[in-house]
């Protein structure tokens, strides 16, 4: 029996190319979807059509996104079209985590399915600890942060330590990183924890070593859809290719012109070689834009057409009207900020736009300070997107560590984080004794403490504290089996003394931390399984960019963070050589770097729906130095006939207030 279609006319709302993609059901499909062309609508319509035509049951369909927000939106939109249950919609990491939760023991490496996922900060802490132990590593020259970046890159490329080639370890830093990588993986194994790179890395190892396991998931996921394919790294690409190799019913949606995450492992070549990977693939282009005006689309197309390594496509719209793009020359970066502040003030006071629909998108973080000053002086409400995220705050990470050690007693990082929080009279000497004992016997710190307590080889005060803590951890584990996550976490907060510690501080900071913990409890209350919450919180930290409404404040954010968003009015400041395109990108990656910078410009331009301002300064203060500058080459790539080019000085008399 066919699942019930909620909206019988959903195909009639698609344009010709969208409908062609939604009706395509057999064989590989590459959907080249330009900015604002309705790709999510097509993806969800395609899923609904596959189910409605009885080509697959919902649980045989796998849809992969890059963020939890995108996964949730896709799921909701599918359910608005067709009444079905059991769809597999999630991020790369969440889907990989589910597979490993069921299959990790088939890797025969020593992991079990009670593994936990450690955060970025915990990964860095572990690297630091390893570097400290290796006395021959100069930590000032070869910093743990750099070593961690290299290890993460290798994982994104699908490379375990034993698969690194000579070319991967040519440089002294790479040689050291390999040594640390080997020790790092051993530590993860002892603690029964994985980092984010491991999720795809071990999935791929699992599929290669266990053809029967791969076949099981190929049969399970007969239809595969991948969103934002241009942002995939090598490990994600290999994972998708293996899963799709049996039935070849894979639909990859992306826009190579919006591939802007090369610095974090994204490989634009994945989308460019799709036709080679899947012979006979169908290619459909979505070029009709439903977001921006004609001048904005013309600007975007003219800029991106200067890139050589791309699939040819041209955005167009039914609308023939639209404001010309304003390109403003300013004397300095301070004047640039004042001009933008005054222009925003005028737009809002004239009731042309709401402040919440206006954004300033910068290429680099150092550009934001001048806007903060200008907005404060002009009493313009604003918010800077960035900084510390919720799940990265100290108190949240502490509570997460308590939960993790309760679920997985071998989690060394979690135990070390909470062992003395609140204070338990466990000094440095006791901690070192525990670490050394564990290291010598190749066991976890938790197991080491148990053995030390049995021997009695520790100070009396520490003995009582450690015995009490271990007993509580055992109790919390048992409680998680029989009680709801929210009840157990509340018990942890009370029994551990953590909440009492904050209450005793009686400071504004402590009060804020308690409020954050209460907010965390509200999130936990939505989960029936604590493992689901732990995975969710970890993946949110890695994947989410912005999950908030725009309110009545102007948004200031980087161009990278703005991808996927849209605003009525967009200001693009700092379009000068050296700032944008970034000199660092040009120096390090040459033509490849320039093409990525141009894609970033394309993303910035296409965030605007109605009005676009591009500004550049004749001089700019960069790290305390005044630097003379030239307009960005990208400005010269925008045709004169769709622009109004002027100087901010011409407008001083009309609206600047002193």
Curated annotation (Swiss-Prot):
ATP binds at residues 36-41, 291. The keyword ATP-binding applies. Residues 294-564 form the UvrD-like helicase C-terminal domain. The keyword Secreted does not apply. Belongs to the helicase family. UvrD subfamily. This is Probable DNA helicase II homolog. Keywords: ATP-binding, DNA damage, DNA repair, DNA replication, DNA-binding, Helicase, Hydrolase, Isomerase, Nucleotide-binding. It is an enzyme of class 5 (isomerase). NCBIfam families: pcrA. One of its GO terms (cellular component) is cytosol. GO terms for biological process: DNA replication; recombinational repair. Its EC number is 5.6.2.4. Has both ATPase and helicase activities. Unwinds DNA duplexes with 3' to 5' polarity with respect to the bound strand and initiates unwinding most effectively when a single-stranded region is present. Involved in the post-incision events of nucleotide excision repair and methyl-directed mismatch repair. GO terms for molecular function: 3'-5' DNA helicase activity; ATP binding; ATP hydrolysis activity; DNA binding. Residues 12-293 form the UvrD-like helicase ATP-binding domain. It catalyses: Couples ATP hydrolysis with the unwinding of duplex DNA by translocating in the 3'-5' direction; ATP + H2O = ADP + phosphate + H(+).
